[in-house]
Amino acid sequence: MGSLSIWHWLIVGAVVLLVFGGKGKISDIMGDVAKGIKSFKRGLSEDEEKAEAKPVGEPSLRSLDHQGAGDPLKTPDARKIG
């Protein structure tokens, strides 16, 4: 239990290479994450601007003419027949 196996050393080596190896790989990764977050926020603000641009009024519904609506048996034409 006190000794480390080969898998432990491989994981430690990979972490060390990731942190200290190359030309700022961590900073590149964090820069990409920051760009993604900024792009996401920009997309959200554009969606909010589009939603605010739409007028919030009554929905455009076609109106129906209800002047002749009623009991069809009580119309003047129906009384003449019966």
From Swiss-Prot:
It is found in: Cell inner membrane. The keyword Membrane applies. Keywords: Cell inner membrane, Cell membrane, Membrane, Protein transport, Translocation, Transmembrane, Transmembrane helix, Transport. One of its GO terms (molecular function) is protein transmembrane transporter activity. GO terms for cellular component: TAT protein transport complex. The chain crosses the membrane at residues 1-21. It comes from the Bacteria. Its main location: membrane. Gene3D superfamilies: 1.20.5.3310. GO terms for biological process: protein transport by the Tat complex. Residues 43-82 are annotated as: Disordered. Part of the twin-arginine translocation (Tat) system that transports large folded proteins containing a characteristic twin-arginine motif in their signal peptide across membranes. TatA could form the protein-conducting channel of the Tat system. Belongs to the TatA/E family. The Tat system comprises two distinct complexes: a TatABC complex, containing multiple copies of TatA, TatB and TatC subunits, and a separate TatA complex, containing only TatA subunits. Substrates initially bind to the TatABC complex, which probably triggers association of the separate TatA complex to form the active translocon. This is Sec-independent protein translocase protein TatA. It comes from Methylocella silvestris (strain DSM 15510 / CIP 108128 / LMG 27833 / NCIMB 13906 / BL2). The gene is tatA.
